A protein has these predicted regions:
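Conserved glycine-rich cofactor-binding loop
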Residues: 8, 15-17
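Conserved glycine-rich Rossmann-like NAD(P)H-binding loop of the short-chain dehydrogenase/reductase
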Residues: 29-46
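Conserved NAD(P)H cofactor-binding loop of Rossmann-fold oxidoreductase domains
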Residues: 90-95
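Substrate-binding pocket helix/loop in short-chain dehydrogenase/reductase
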Residues: 98-99, 106-111
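Active-site helix of classical SDR
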Residues: 122, 158
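Residue(s) in the substrate-gating loop at a strand-loop-helix junction
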Residues: 142
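C-terminal helical subdomain
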Residues: 184-186, 200-251
Length: 267
């Protein structure tokens, strides 16, 4: 097995869309990659595409469904000995339906992927690499992680979790003096397989549905801008589709007088 001494970037959900383009973008910068997704054939195709122009890179592909309980932990254990520097939690999907009509099996799987797997990976990556120079955790949220979108309440709730969790983690890391940085990327409508999955549709036309939208390559470019910046949030405006690099958006009760006193013994 080829294993380099450089630092690796892990990208989940790398078989299509933003994850696919982000993998190519990081490879373009000379980063070795560990790519995870359900569809191993697409990962292998991506690996071949990258190596055709960057043959010196180490591109590790792992076919895994991280929405299945236990698979996220197993995947992490398989790669934890690699010298990791960047982890991008991109895997996720959405759902368009009224809460009272939504398919609960689909919602359960969505929460396992959007929330549970992301939290497991974030926690373990921070635990093992928080003092690694240059380490970054980038969690993919959504513009719907800062604004509630009609007919997408459950999806937005899952992305509000991603946004608030990552913003809070970013504060924890900074206040603890850790070298790692945590960031949130929140794109607006992007032409990917998201539309078909969210609507349980065989075909989905972004031109008809939205009129204005990002390409996956544009979104990956914005993600790189966030990676290069010292800001916590990279947010695409849902109306103008302009990209903003900002500080954390949620209120943080760090100095609230009614916070739990951490110096007290808790029984």
């Amino acid at each position: 097995m080829k294993r380099h001494t450089g630092r690796y970037t892990v990208i989940t959900g790398a078989s299509s869309g933003i994850g696919y383009e982000t993998a190519k973008a990081f490879a373009g910068r000379g980063s070795d990659l560990i790519l995870a997704a359900r569809r191993g054939d697409r990962l292998e195709a991506l690996r071949r595409e990258i190596l055709s122009s960057r043959p010196a890179l180490d591109i590790v592909v792992k076919a895994v469904d991280i929405s299945v309980p236990g698979n996220a932990l197993q995947f992490y254990e398989e790669i934890r000995e690699y010298p990791l520097q960047t982890w991008i939690n991109n895997a996720g999907f959405g759902n368009y339906d009224a809460v009272g009509h939504q398919n609960l099996d689909k919602i359960r799987q969505m929460l396992r992927l959007n929330v549970e797997a992301l939290t497991i990976f974030s926690s373990l990556f921070v635990r093992d690499f928080q003092d690694t120079e240059g380490a970054q955790l980038i969690n993919i949220s959504s513009a719907g992680g800062y604004t509630i979108v009609p007919a997408a309440v459950s999806y937005c709730a899952s992305k509000f979790y991603v946004s608030s969790f990552t913003e809070g983690l970013a504060r924890e890391l900074k206040e603890s003096g850790c070298r790692m940085r945590a960031k949130v990327f929140a794109p607006a409508a992007t032409e990917t397989e998201f539309g078909k999955v969210a609507n349980d549709a065989v075909e989905y036309d972004y031109e008809t549905a939205f009129g204005t939208y990002l390409t996956s390559a544009q979104a990956a470019g914005f993600l790189l801008e966030l990676y290069d910046s010292d800001k916590v949030v990279g947010l695409v405006d849902r109306e103008s589709f302009s990209f903003q690099l900002t500080e954390a958006q949620f209120h943080y009760a760090g100095d609230a007088k009614h916070n739990q006193n951490s110096s007290r013994e808790i029984n």
